[in-house]
Swiss-Prot record:
Natural source organism: Borreliella burgdorferi (strain ATCC 35210 / DSM 4680 / CIP 102532 / B31)
SMART domains the record matches: M16C_associated (SM01264)
Organism taxonomic ancestry: Bacteria, Pseudomonadati, Spirochaetota, Spirochaetia, Spirochaetales
Recorded superkingdom: Bacteria
GO BP terms: protein processing
Name by which UniProt lists this protein: Uncharacterized protein BB_0228
Pfam families: M16C_assoc (PF08367), Peptidase_M16 (PF00675), Peptidase_M16_C (PF05193), PreP_C (PF22516)
Single Gene Ontology MF annotation: metalloendopeptidase activity
Coiled coil regions, renumbered to chain: none
């Protein structure tokens, strides 16, 4: 009897830009599968996706995305996702809620691990337990004693709504849709999240998590048939639901005949905070792929610093800087283009709108400079031809779902090169393609909103008051019915018991894990680099698509304290100012038309003996036919940069100020860690000067009048004279032929010879040896806290380092997750050991002192209780997995170079890997005791919290750390 085909092949399509075949299948259940297959792909990935349409702001899709991984019919443990974090070799593991879809992607370089991940994801998504206790944990819960509310999603979104830019993004999207999915925040608004009922939550799952609403994207080198058989066995056969015929298409909105003017309040960071103006257009459907890609390119053109549109609007003085919202949003069925200014003059929204339209009309009239268009398109061409690194399949999947979930073939939105060629052909025929887009989607498009965002101290207060009002009403209502109140208390008590309950060994044992023999025991060895000592140059030959890479390293040995603060502006200015021979517009066009990519950064490094090896790094890459041109351009920038271009310097300085100002909420945990580490090591102190709260405060106070700009320019000149020096410079060059490497070597030699010698003395700073450990509480305007504690620990060459590194993984992916995230309600918690410092931190945390207690209690538990052999093995898998990821050859070469500079040998790395395999439960018990001693002997604490949390927990804080701490406010 002939075997019936389970899946019908709809099409087979070759995707040229990725040298891959795309197989598109449909199952009779309605489930669709697309497999993008190529033997060149280094990791295998899958993504299970559903269209999920919100009808309110309760964040039900978001809460469901979190709760999906709280146990399933086959894997009844409380958090299978946590076991994947600590016990798989994954290269990607996540779940994401978008405005109109929810996706569940994962990836691994090991085929067996890939199918293990797929197995757990499949059962979690299609057969979840969805217990009420999980709903309360991940969504929100109300304590019957005081009717205070908490929950992971609730706290996450409180943090999000404390962030000005996040709030603006959400308001802009909803402003263009008077009805339908995009009117609502799929993540949830805190005031509405507490309205979500458990029954509505279950109904949402039943409606949207069906086979006919499911799309599965596969990417990698595994066999297509093997994947389809897996899906049939683990998804389709166990599926119990009846087929649903619910229509979940998103209707296009009716276009307006006239734009709308709106006003909203946003959080006021300080008394001097200024507002934001934005104008936002609803553009085109995603199925108009050419224009969608065209609008993406147009967005880059309009927002380019050399475009007259941006230049003239900034010159107007209406606002200080381009708003973060500016650009194209293609995550929706219909795209949105926004342009905005931040720190604006009050009551100038009409002038702002008129100026935007006037400058757009001028661009159409005078035409966009061809060199600008050519440069932007060159960047796209280069990106398509460059070797792809880690998580490249995930980016492809997200891009595919934009069209696939809205009725297009899954490969359509991946065919970027085809549509760019179509656009290029039109340009070559003399068609003013981008000017036509400006007219069609911006100038003559009446479906737009002009929004004034006014800073107010009332926004968060009003949100808290609304939450309190709802909770009070809920309390009165529940307490009026004794039976209902009794059930309410029972539910909460059951929830707390659930959180404290341990998973059974029998349930844990059901999880599919890799065997010990599946784990790579040998490290990936460093690459052999060729060295030319007299030039301080290393080189590496590798297969590339006729692309070369150059990494320049300038030592930072001659800097003083203030110099480090100016580094942030210095690295921006090098890319964004005029030079002796070129205006800013001309040098910008040359960069875009010559370099495929340029990146300027700094590294704060120590070698294995603790010697500081900090460097200022300039990396660039391009096609082989642009070697000489690229080096000439870099030479022009390094030697002839004009820091005294005051008009442009002012714009860059204001942009830096605004970027620093917006760091607090999205990067609060990193700022707390930087601050905490700064009293423990000189290098951490220097890093904090540049990138931390010290740097932020300095630039917030910086003035931009003419005299101040002259002083800044002189500082930058001085900094250049200390860094861009012949005897400071070393390099790593990479290319695909001996001839190219020789060309690169010659050009590097010429560059080096054109630089001046140093006449400075080593200026490394000293950290005050008598400085006390930091105890600092920083008051910020946020409804959530960011806590960090750091302390001296083991360096990489210490015999205890492998055990401490293993403990880091146990804390980060195990006990901190349980105590701080699951039970504490924080959005995240971390542990890391690097350069002899152990760091613990929490992110978007509703707690303050409780988190510090949780850090220490976690260590106490591990010191007082032995882990099992099975637990050790699970963590071993995950720890090995943190060292396995997809790297390009260029990345491998750069890593090898850095290891050589830091004296980290392959033999040391192999010794550490070997040690991981010998670690026992007793070792973890002992190392936990040692780390506990370390944290108690000498630690440094920094917390970013709001004033209310601080006042409420002040007494607890002083019991924990005493009264000797500093208190400061920042905005």
């Amino acid at each position: 009897m002939k075997k019936k085909k389970i899946f019908k092949l709809i099409s087979k399509t070759y995707l040229e830009e990725h040298d891959a075949e795309g197989y598109y299948f449909k199952h009779e259940s309605g489930l669709e599968v697309f497999h993008l297959k190529s033997d060149s792909f280094k990791e295998n990935a899958f993504c299970i996706a559903f269209k999920t349409i919100p009808s309110n702001n309760t964040g039900v899709a978001h809460v469901l995305e979190h709760t999906i991984f709280c146990g399933s019919s086959k894997y009844k443990i409380k958090d299978p996702f946590l076991y994947l974090l600590k016990g798989s070799l994954n290269t990607f593991l996540n779940a994401m809620t978008f405005p109109d879809k929810t996706i569940y992607p994962a990836a691994s370089t090991i085929e067996k691990d890939y199918f293990n991940l797929f197995n757990i994801y499949a059962d979690s998504i299609f057969n979840p337990l969805l217990k009420k206790e999980s709903f309360m944990q991940e969504g929100y819960n109300i304590n019957p004693k005081d009717f205070k509310v908490s929950g992971i999603v609730f706290n996450e979104m409180k943090g999000s709504y404390s962030n000005k830019n996040s709030l603006i993004n959400e308001i802009v999207s909803s402003s263009l849709f008077e009805e339908g999915a995009y009117k609502y925040d799929s993540g949830g608004i805190p005031t509405n999240i507490i309205d979500l009922t458990y029954e509505s939550f279950l109904d949402f799952y039943k409606k949207y998590y069906t086979l006919e609403n499911c799309k599965i994207f596969l990417c990698g080198n595994t066999q297509t048939e093997k994947n389809l058989n897996f899906i049939e066995k683990y998804i389709i056969r166990p599926y119990k639901k009846e087929k649903s015929n619910v229509n979940i298409n998103i209707e296009n909105v009716k276009r307006w005949e006239k734009g709308k003017k709106l006003t909203y309040k946003i959080p006021k960071e300080n008394d001097n905070s200024l507002g934001v103006y934005t104008i936002n257009w609803l553009c085109t459907e995603i199925n108009n792929i050419e224009d969608s890609i065209g609008l993406e390119i147009l967005s880059e053109i309009l927002l380019d610093d050399s475009c007259s549109f941006t230049i003239n609007i900034l010159k107007s003085g209406i606002g200080e800087d381009i708003a973060h919202i500016s650009g194209i949003n293609t995550d929706l069925k219909e795209s949105i283009f926004s342009f905005g200014l931040q720190n604006v003059v009050e009551n100038k929204e009409k002038e702002f709108k008129n100026l935007v339209f006037s400058e757009l009309k001028n661009l159409v009239k005078n035409k966009i400079p061809k060199e600008l268009i050519k440069g932007i398109l060159f960047g796209y061409e280069f990106a398509l031809k460059e070797e792809k690194g880690q998580n490249f399949p995930i980016a492809l999947m997200i891009k595919s779902f934009k069209g696939w979930l809205n009725g297009l073939h899954p490969i359509k939105t991946l065919q970027t090169s085809y549509y760019i060629n179509e656009i290029t052909n039109k340009l070559e025929k003399g068609i003013y393609y981008f000017e036509n887009l400006i007219e069609k989607y911006l100038i003559f498009n009446n479906h737009y909103t002009l929004i004034s965002f006014i800073p107010s101290h009332d926004t968060e207060k009003e949100m808290e008051e609304e939450i309190e009002k709802k909770l009070m009403a809920r309390e009165i209502e529940i307490k009026q019915n004794p039976e209902e109140f009794l059930q309410f208390k029972k539910d909460y008590n059951q929830f707390k018991k659930y959180q404290n309950k341990k998973d059974s060994k029998a349930d844990i044992a059901k999880l599919p894990l890799l065997k010990i023999e599946d784990l790579p025991k040998q490290i990936e060895k460093s690459l052999d680099l060729n060295e030319i000592k007299e030039l301080n140059l290393h080189s590496f030959k590798f297969k590339s698509n006729n692309i070369f890479n150059v990494n320049l390293f300038f030592k930072l040995d001659f800097l003083e304290k203030e110099d480090y603060i100016y580094l942030s502006l210095f690295k921006r200015a090098l890319q964004d100012l005029s030079t002796k021979n070129y205006s800013y517009i001309n040098i910008n066009n040359k960069i875009q038309n010559t370099l495929g990519q340029i990146n300027i950064s700094e590294s704060y490094d120590e070698d294995i003996d603790g010697n500081i090896l900090n460097s200022f790094n300039i990396s660039f890459k391009s096609f082989n036919n642009k070697v000489k041109e690229s080096f000439e351009l870099i030479k022009e920038i390094l030697i002839n940069i004009n820091f005294h271009d005051y008009e442009r310097l002012k714009e860059i300085t204001l942009s830096l100020k605004n970027d620093f100002k917006s760091l607090l909420i999205p990067k609060g945990h990193l700022l707390a860690m930087l601050r905490s580490k700064s009293k423990l090591k000189l290098n951490e102190y220097l890093k904090e000067l540049q990138n931390g709260i010290t740097g932020r405060e300095f630039w917030q106070k910086a003035k931009t009048d003419t005299e101040s700009l002259k002083e800044i320019a002189n500082k930058l000149d001085n900094l250049k004279n200390k860094i861009i020096l012949k005897n400071n410079l070393s390099a790593l060059i990479m290319g695909n032929t001996d001839d190219i490497l020789k060309n690169l070597e010659n050009e590097f030699f010429n560059l080096k010879e054109s630089l001046e010698e140093s006449n400075h003395y080593n200026g490394l700073l000293n950290l005050d040896a008598n400085s006390k450990a930091l105890r600092e509480i920083i008051i910020i305007q946020s409804k959530v806290a960011f806590n960090a504690i750091c302390f001296p620990s083991y360096k990489i060459n210490d015999e205890n380092y492998p055990k401490a590194n293993f403990l880091e993984h146990v804390l980060r992916s195990g006990i901190f997750w349980e105590k701080i995230r699951v039970m504490g309600g924080a959005y995240g918690a971390s542990a890391s050991i690097a350069n002899g410092i152990f760091s613990f931190a929490s992110y978007r945390d509703p707690n303050f002192t409780k988190t510090y207690q949780a850090f220490e209690k976690s260590l106490e538990e591990l010191a007082n209780n032995k882990m099992t052999d099975d637990e050790i093995y699970t963590y071993l898998i995950g720890l090995i997995g943190t060292n396995i990821y997809v790297k390009t050859k260029a990345t491998e070469a750069l890593q090898s170079y850095r290891r050589k500079m830091l004296n980290i040998s392959d033999s040391l790395r192999q010794d550490i890997r070997n040690a991981y395999f010998t670690i026992t439960p007793q070792d973890i018990k002992e190392i936990s005791t040692k780390i506990l001693t370390q944290i108690r002997q000498h630690n440094s604490i920094a917390s970013l919290v709001n004033n209310q949390i601080y006042e409420e927990e002040k007494n607890n804080l002083e019991k924990l750390i005493g009264k000797e701490y500093s208190l400061k406010k920042i905005y």
